[in-house]
Structure formats: C-alpha cells, structure tokens
Amino acid sequence: MSNLKQLRTRIKSVKSTQKITKAMQLVSASKLTKIKNQIAHSNFYVEAISKMMSTVLSADIYDFPIEAQKFFNTETNKANLLIVMTSERGLCGTFNYMIIKQVKSDVETLKSKGEKIKLIIIGKKGYEALKKPYESYIDSYFELPKNHDENLMLQIKQKIMALVANLEVSNCTIYFNRFKNAMTQSMTKQQILPIEKYHDDSKIEEANYEYEGENLIQNLINLYVNSQINYALLQNRASEEGSRMTAMENATNNAHDIINKLVLKLNRSRQAIITTELIEIIAGSEAV
C-alpha cells in the first residue's frame, strides 16, 4: 500500500508541475504576440533611419562636426565594446547559453591579440555567467524590465555615446538572438560602430533636408544608435519568449507522458494487490 501512496503522491506532484509549465507557456505565447507586433512596427523605423543615413553619407555634402567624426573613427587602439543581451530568467532552453558561449569565445580571441575590451551586459543571466571570468572588463550592467521599456534603450544609448565621445571605444558590437519563429532563434552579433561612410554622387540630389549639416549628422547618429539598440532588444525579447514557450510546451508534454506511465504503473500495482488478495481468499476458503 505504501507503494501506491508514493505513486499517487508523485502523480499529484507531476500534475502540479504540468499546470505551472502550461501556464508559463500561455504567458510566453501572449507576450510573444505583443512583441511581434512591436517588431513589425519598429522594422519600418529601422529601415527608414538606415536609408536616411545611407543617403546623407552617400551625398557627402556636409562637413562632419568633430563629435560626429568619433562615430566613424576606425582607430584600432581603442577598446572593443561588446553589448551582451541575455535574459533575467531561465527556463528558456539554450537561449542564454549560445550568446554567452559566443561572447566568451570572442573575448578570449581579443585577449589573445592584446586588444582592449569593454562589456555592457543586459540581463541577469549574462551578468551571472560573465561576472567571475571577466569582471575587470564589465563597464555597465542593466537589468531587464518585465516589459519592453524605452528607458532601457535610452540608458544604453547614452552609455555608448559617452564612451565614444570620451574616445574610450572605437567599435561596438551587439550580441543578441534574432527571432525567426517560436522554435527557431539565431545567435547574432551585429557591429553598429564605427559607421561606414559611403560616397555616391548619384545620391546628392536626394539629400534635401531642412536641418543644418552639423545638427543633421548628430541627430541622425542618435536616431541610428537608438534604432539599432531598440531592434536588438525587441528581437532578443521575442526570441526569449519564443524559446521559453517552446521549452514549456516540451515540459508540459513530457509531464503528460510521465503521468500516463505513472498511472499505468499505479493501475498495475493495484491489480497485483487485488489479485494477491483474491488468491489468499480463495486459498483460505479451500482450506476451510
């Protein structure tokens, strides 16, 4: 009987876990739908800013102010800025692992070349994984809010702008997961600085803006950095929720399989006990 009690307790425990994983799956699915809508709206903005930047730089009719020139600087004696985007929570498959693995590999490569490194880490999981081996390289750490927040984007942008303005870094690469669908996310590293300068005389006629040259370039740089950070944050958030939704769906299905096996084992144990009792009763009646 004690074996039956243990089986019932275990079945109850697995059912409880199944309810939790199912709830988490539904929450992630709901969040993912909202984020996908945000991505759809932001894609147009990112493309528009990139096109505007390309047009102005191709025209090459403006004098670049000193502060703006720092964002096009290709000097190699400055630090490499790595922006690492992870999550606050786990239970999302290999979402964080792939990012952290790539960052560690790249940091070790840069170290072997004797290059300077600065890390900006977003998300508790990334900070926990990178703090011990690379604490001296960490410049900033930002916690992720529960929902996509423009304040976080502005804080990261201001940090990047300050580091570039102070001539501490010459290039900036963002590490994030690019969202494809709920089951597929690809680890992506995207270099956003230095900004490449183009020259194409065919673009000159298209460059017709009311801003003064210096203000235009500086404002475009601000918008460009903003759009790139916002894009990466949204992609990473969607990838996190998609990965968690898939992981929780798999966990729910596994729990269902375990419950079926335990119920089958429980029924067989009960049948064995009943059969044993019947045999004892029959044997007793025959003895009488």
Swiss-Prot record:
InterPro entries found in the cross-reference section: ATP_synth_F1_ATPase_gsu, ATP_synth_F1_gsu
Location(s), subcellular: Cell inner membrane
Pfam families recorded: ATP-synt
Membrane topology: Peripheral membrane protein
GO CC terms of this entry: plasma membrane; proton-transporting ATP synthase complex
Disulphide bonds in the chain: none
GO molecular-function terms, A-Z: ATP binding; proton-transporting ATP synthase activity, rotational mechanism
Subunit: F-type ATPases have 2 components, CF(1) - the catalytic core - and CF(0) - the membrane proton channel. CF(1) has five subunits: alpha(3), beta(3), gamma(1), delta(1), epsilon(1). CF(0) has three main subunits: a, b and c.
Family designation: Belongs to the ATPase gamma chain family.
Protein role: Produces ATP from ADP in the presence of a proton gradient across the membrane. The gamma chain is believed to be important in regulating ATPase activity and the flow of protons through the CF(0) complex.
Protein name stated in the entry: ATP synthase gamma chain
